[in-house]
Amino acid sequence: MEMKDFIFTSESVSEGHPDKVADQVSDAILDAILTQDPKSRVACETLVTTGMTVVAGEITTNAIVDYPKIVRETIKEIGYNDSAMGFDWETCAVLTSIDKQSPDIAQGVTEGEGLFKEQGAGDQGLMFGYACNETPELMPMSILLSHKLVKKLADVRKSGVLDFLRPDSKSQVSIQYINDRPVHVDTVVISSQHTPEVSYETIKEGIIEEVVKKIIPEELMDAKTRFLINPTGRFVIGGPMGDCGLTGRKIIVDSYGGHGAHGGGAFSGKDPSKVDRSAAYMGRYVAKNLVAAGLCEKCEVQVAYAIGVAEPVSVMVDTSGTGKIPSARIAQIVREVFDLRPRAIIEQLDLLRPIYKKTAAYGHFGRELPEFTWERTDKVSIIREKAGI
């Protein structure tokens, strides 16, 4: 059999990246609303640009929320605290344009209304979940390391270890795979915003020593590994001053870094009646439990819905030939073990809680935090029993 030898690349962005600022604002608003009224319907979009934040969307709720206060608190936590950056929490304008959810949509997702009496999906669409056994977190290594690099950048910035860093940054990790197993880090790219006066040499040395070498396992690097740190040579103008940021523009960063497929729907700013979010979380839960149970080495799950209809119109499982039993049988087990109706997903994963701001930076998947219920592997025993392994 021919040996498979290839390089796969994934990227991540920090909490200070303009698109991620927008995601975090949208999810901070969602959390504030769910705290008061868990049954709220929220579709909250955010735009950030030089000196301005715009919040718009369709929100039906009994909650009373101070939108500008939430926006400013979120921006402050991220670290935009100086008007010299062209965007800061104290002086930026905050504009809001909030309507209510369309009654035509509402009747399809409210139990007892619409053509079908169960709580239906909030929209049509297809969602994917993915897991693989190349890391303990059952995530692809390239996206996992990319997330950890930008999280470390934020940590050393906020702690003062590298006090010349500013909030906006990106990472990219290229990994050599041989026969589908990660064996070597080929290239690490990091671009981080910084203060104007610091030298390039200081930036490069600081990031390699305090970030890259603290995150990338030593055994995966050698003399051939390339480090490209701020490869333009200068990154002073950044954040919303450098680029306009929008909610939902980093869907591959949010999911699996290019591994597996993506249905196209973003997560942030959406309450869990929106299957773009809740069914994608459920897809991860299903795929992770299948891999953890040993049914396969990698797994992609697709689920699709029609608006207003509770039962998914299709469920597909693809193990890329790594399954110990046929994929059709695995899909049947998924149907038997997991209830994929929207209300059941919300109940199983306990999604009517203010947990979403934490998801909005450094990945929705692969972080085993208490709030991330979709990362649990509590279905392993019943899956193995049904599979007979």
Swiss-Prot record:
User: Which pathway, per its entry?
Assistant: Amino-acid biosynthesis; S-adenosyl-L-methionine biosynthesis; S-adenosyl-L-methionine from L-methionine: step 1/1
Positions bound to K(+): 45
Q: Which GO terms describe its biological process?
A: one-carbon metabolic process; S-adenosylmethionine biosynthetic process
Q: InterPro entries recorded for this chain?
A: ADOMET_SYNTHASE_CS, S-AdoMet_synt_C, S-AdoMet_synt_central, S-AdoMet_synt_N, S-AdoMet_synthetase, S-AdoMet_synthetase_sfam
Q: Where does L-methionine bind?
A: 58, 101, 243, 274
Q: Which cofactor does it need?
A: Mg(2+); K(+)
**A Pfam family per the record:** S-AdoMet_synt_C
EC numbers on record: 2.5.1.6
Q: Where is this region: Flexible loop?
A: 101-111
Q: What class of enzyme is it?
A: transferase
Name the positions where ATP binds: 17, 168-170, 234-235, 243, 249-250, 266, 270
> GO cellular-component terms in the record?
cytoplasm
> Quick check: keyword Transferase in the entry?
yes
* Locations listed in the record: Cytoplasm
Q: Which residues bind Mg(2+)?
A: 19
Which branch of life, at top level? Bacteria
Which reaction equation describes what this protein catalyses? L-methionine + ATP + H2O = S-adenosyl-L-methionine + phosphate + diphosphate
Q: Which CDD domains match?
A: S-AdoMet_synt
Protein's UniProt keywords contain Nucleotidyltransferase: no
Cofactor comment in the record? Binds 2 divalent ions per subunit. Binds 1 potassium ion per subunit.
Give the chief site where it resides. Answer: cytoplasm
Assembly, in brief, is: Homotetramer; dimer of dimers.
What family is it from? Belongs to the AdoMet synthase family.
This chain's protein is named S-adenosylmethionine synthase
What organism does the UniProt record list as the source?
Geotalea uraniireducens (strain Rf4)
